[in-house]
Amino acid sequence: MSHGRSVADADRDVRQYLVRITAHLGEVLGDNLAGLYVHGSLASGAFHRERSDIDLIAVTAAKLSAPMRESVAHALVRLSDARPTAGDIEVSIIQERYARAFEHPMPYDVHYSTAWHEPIRRRQFDFTIDRTNADLAANIVDVRERGVTLYGPPPSTMKS
């Protein structure tokens, strides 16, 4: 069994893909993008391109409107379709205030994973509903402790 990889020693196409994700989210979110962080296996050195997903947390300065949520979700669908790995991307977009001061379950503006791909692509998803996720608090702790910054301040600054 091969050893896992981290962002630093990931294959070139994976690193380039992270650059593309960062650029696309920056284009869609503009000045509202406060930070973008890798967590999970790719941050910890346990990433295997043939099976691991790419876990990301995007932090925004302000809440996203429903049309912006939809635009971001569709951008994530397109990015997923262009991924260089077998595992998909898993992205949660949360407001900075929640990244700094936990609320449980944690509110989020957008979540993308394989399970959400088709409902988003087929426009069968209601972006006007505010949602929460009980797992996001653990993901934020993971980002704070082992996260890799793609954009924004170091993840350790995500504390109140």
Locate the predicted segments by residue.
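Phosphate-binding glycine-rich loops and adjacent basic patches that engage nucleotide phosphates
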Residues: R20, L29-S41, D130-V141
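Residue-level preference for alpha-helix termini and adjacent loops
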Residues: N32, S41, A46, D53, ...
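Conserved NTP/Mg2+-binding pocket subregion across the NTase superfamily
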Residues: S2-V7, H74-S160
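Catalytic metal-binding acidic patch
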Residues: G40, S44-H74, D88-Q95
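Hydrophobic alpha-helical packing residues
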Residues: I21, L25, V72-L79
